[in-house]
């Protein structure tokens, strides 16, 4: 297994772009997502019912596609994510079916410093199928941690305090 060092906010640039590994959507994914969310709509889980529906076969839950994209893009790139703060303009352009092979394409479209510890990253993300078709896309906004340098630490010895607490750390001096 390869260890990937996550990127910090200051290592990211507008225009940086990544493509994830591929993932095949399985029947078990639809069933597991239905069990997790409680959305057992037969359009997703019943082949016979779905055959008479608009797609002629079971279609993945829209939010399953978004969830797959979140997982696929978590290592493309690996970053020091602190929080997801917003999703904007999310579109479900085409259905995702069992057997589809999907990947995430990610591009940084904006960076905003947010204090000393984090920065806000605006990611344009697309879920692409095996035909090269965009099936979902939109903007996800996350807080990404900065690599804050360690403060200057000095160790003080105190002759009047017991040995259990004799070493004190002073930060920022």
Language model region names:
Residues 1-13, 92, 96-101, 105-173:
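HotDog/MaoC-like acyl-thioester-processing domains
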Residues 2-86, 147-173:
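Hot-dog-fold acyl-thioester-processing enzymes
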Residues 88-90:
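Conserved interaction-surface patches within small, structured recognition/assembly domains
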